[in-house]
């Protein structure tokens, strides 16, 4: 356990590192992904739909799995700059709480809900998913969109999400994973991607059922959408050029290679899963 910060949340060293990364990279990430700050979903991977449109479809994929209704309390673990949380509140009438370790992203998220008139239904906390500052059985629904890659201990985070989820509640996760067997070359590519993304590690897709079970949850669905998300790689590459003033041409080229190599990797994976609390 790390020291409590001023907002009463327990932060470990890696969570602080992730928060610092998102504080510093916020504008880059918004240039890369638009305000969704997550991968896109292409039903036809050969299509040329823009990333902004595909990003909205990814949010919809999670929404369809959560079955959210008006009156539900929803937790968004790793909420980014708050666009999916605001979208969900508008779409369903639910009350949404976002948790994030980046102060800069939270500032943007709070400005968003103020400008959209959603302050009565959407709020945000500086909070570490390893030690969620909420009482047991607090939420009807939880989603975690691409935040699991930053978690030092996925078992701990799964237990925490299960703890704050009410009996009968539902959890949806979107996560970047690996598939198949990784040789030395693939391992090096994954390590380069993790360094670039400040990811602790990538889980193997085959390990997720056990993670869900150990947390005391029932796995309802696990879908491999690797090919439907792979177009995110080339769609994002041009945005790295905004780093030219700070990294120079060589640094940007290295970053593009680390990013592009991951999406070229056969073992690249992306999973959508839904779990329920008995």
Curated annotation (Swiss-Prot):
Its EC number is 2.1.1.-. InterPro entries: Erg6_SMT_methyltransf, MeTfrase_dom, Methyltransf_11, SAM-dependent_MTases_sf. SUPFAM superfamilies: S-adenosyl-L-methionine-dependent methyltransferases. S-adenosyl-L-methionine binds at residues 105, 128-129, 150. Keywords: Antibiotic biosynthesis, Methyltransferase, S-adenosyl-L-methionine, Transferase. One of its GO terms (molecular function) is S-adenosylmethionine-dependent methyltransferase activity. GO terms for biological process: antibiotic biosynthetic process; methylation. Pfam families: Methyltransf_11. Changing residue 175 to A: 3-fold increased KM for SAM, slightly decreased kcat with 25-O-demethyl-FD-891. The active site is at 146 (proton acceptor). Disruption phenotype: Bacteria make 25-O-demethyl-FD-891. Double gfsF-gfsG deletions make a diastereomeric mxiture of 25-oxo-FD-892. The macrolide antibiotics FD-891 and FD-892 induce morphological changes of human promyelocytic leukemia (HL-60) cells and have cytocidal activity against tumor cell lines in vitro. FD-891 produced by Streptomyces sp. MAFF 225003 and MAFF 225006 inhibits growth of rice and alfalfa seedlings and may cause russet scab in potatoes. Belongs to the methyltransferase superfamily. This is Methyltransferase GfsG. It comes from Streptomyces halstedii.
């Amino acid at each position: 356990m790390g020291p409590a910060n001023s907002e009463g949340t327990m932060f470990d060293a890696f969570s602080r590192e992730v928060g610092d990364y998102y504080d510093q990279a916020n504008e880059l990430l918004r240039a890369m992904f638009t305000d969704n700050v997550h991968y896109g979903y292409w039903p036809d991977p050969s299509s040329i739909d823009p990333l902004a449109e595909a990003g909205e479809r990814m949010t919809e994929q999670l929404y369809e799995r959560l079955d959210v209704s008006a009156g539900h309390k929803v937790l968004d673990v790793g909420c980014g700059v708050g666009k999916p949380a605001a979208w969900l509140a508008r779409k369903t009438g639910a009350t949404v709480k976002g948790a994030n370790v980046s102060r800069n992203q939270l500032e943007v998220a709070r400005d968003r809900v103020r400008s959209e008139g959603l302050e009565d239904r959407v709020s945000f906390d500086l909070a570490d998913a390893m030690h969620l500052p909420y009482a047991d059985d607090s939420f009807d629904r939880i989603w975690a969109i691409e935040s699991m890659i930053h978690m030092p201990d996925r078992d701990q985070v799964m237990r925490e999400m299960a703890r704050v989820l009410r009996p009968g509640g539902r959890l949806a996760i979107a996560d970047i994973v690996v598939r198949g067997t990784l040789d030395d070359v693939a391992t090096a590519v994954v390590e380069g991607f993790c360094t670039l993304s400040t990811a602790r590690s990538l889980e193997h897709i085959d390990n997720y059922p056990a993670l869900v079970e150990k947390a005391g949850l029932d796995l309802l669905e696990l879908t491999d959408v690797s090919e439907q998300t792979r177009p995110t790689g080339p769609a994002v590459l041009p945005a790295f050029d905004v780093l030219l003033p700070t990294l120079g041409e060589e640094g940007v080229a290295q970053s593009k290679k680390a990013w592009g190599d991951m999406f070229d990797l056969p073992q690249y994976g992306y999973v959508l899963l839904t779990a329920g609390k008995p």
